[in-house]
Amino acid sequence: MTETKNPLIDSSIGSIARSLVADDHIWTEFLKLQISDHTKRTYASALNDFFVQMTGVKVNPHQIREFLNLPSAQAIAVVLSYRSRLLALNLSPNTINTRLAAIKSLVNHARKLSQCGFSLADVASLKVEAYRDTSGVEPNVYRVMIEAIDTETVGGKRDYAIMRLLWDNALRRSEVTALNIEDFQSDKLWIIRKGKIQKQAIDLAGKTRLALAQWLGVRGGAASQPLFIALDNRAYGKRLSGRSLGYLVERLAQDADVEKRMSPHRVRHSSITAYLDLSDGNVRDARLLSGHAKLETLVIYDDRRKNVQGQVSSKLADLV
């Protein structure tokens, strides 16, 4: 017996299928990929930069469709031209590679939907020298920085809590700014590590717990709201951005007359190096602190901490 097709069902399925490959759907679904919220924000910003630089217009479904419909040679030429522009701006290899990764991710997603006929696999990323500078500041210098914070003020309580997390737990900038109030639970903090989606718990020292509790005592807010917020008039109450966190660390370092230019990442380097000094080079424990995926990264820290290369060069120099 031949089944009679239901035109209503066919029409509905066809409508759904067409909507799934619509211009705006590609962009919407791309932002729902199983990547961390931080990566989503980073990719969205990177793609916007790509379209603004190459077309003068912010990212939108129409621009995405035009790009995805380009012949392969033209699409690759556009992306290579964009990479050249980024190099001319003297951006770091990591920054350039992140922006290229965002474009490649969008193209790969569109290819899965059969909405793109080219690949960007031949667009090479820039070679990055891993952890060229792992130097930081000594613990006594960092102590001067945080002791100068006026913890009697609302801003001071926030800044002190942030600075304790950066040092005591060697957190990355993105790990701090992504925190919500509900992520702080008694003696633990739930964070999203770099490249991960699921949160994991880390233990907090007593000083860190106290600093967070004192900040929350004046911050208030619902559990789902950002743990650290902007306090200036223009952005009050919004999640503290990574850029603002960088300015905060830099300002505190300048106030304390620290000679080195400080950043959240340099604080992280300082913390990891200080623990390696304290533990006589226990790279396995340092890995638990830092959340580095590869143990080899901590070996680089330890070798440079001990100036292994300098010692080797001195021994060779003594031979001739």
Language-model segment annotations:
Residues 1-320:
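Conserved catalytic core of the tyrosine transesterase superfamily
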